Amino acid sequence: QMVGLLESIKPLIRVMEAGLLFIIVTHVVNAVYLTFSNKKAAANRYSVDASATSSVNSRTMIISGTIILLFFIIHLRYIWFTYQAHLFLNESETYYDVLLRNQAGYLGHLPTAIFYIIAILFIASHLKHGVQSALKTFGLTENSKWKILYSGSILIWGIIPLAFISIILSIQFGIIK
């Protein structure tokens, strides 16, 4: 039923996918540009060690961002493209059969599943940091009225990734067949 619904709104989904791709590419280009600009402009000129006041998330953005980019490439290549191009092994194979394949790039493959879990945790951390940094930038963490948004970012950081990870673990433990 869900697949039928998504098929009926496919043009809207395509627009959303293009928008998401644009945002991701813009974010990557901006992050690389800002990283190099900041290193060039502030090479050893600060008297206070920035790592003393910055979070682990903030200090590891380049690592998590690289892993997330690799995740997107793998996910798009193996799962999204396989489904979109109808690269099924036979006519009776479904989208779920594709996910369950025990081949590199698919969720039935243990090393791929482990990588997906790690990547999902990095995505969660990356998003939590982004939301909290944006709230902090606009001064919305000081006012108790806005603290619920700050706390909500932690809640989202925990629940949504666990739902995705539970799917991967269910595939690996044979609950989803």
Model region roles, listed by residue range:
Residues 1-177:
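Membrane-embedded alpha-helical bundles that constitute the cytochrome b-like, heme-associated redox core
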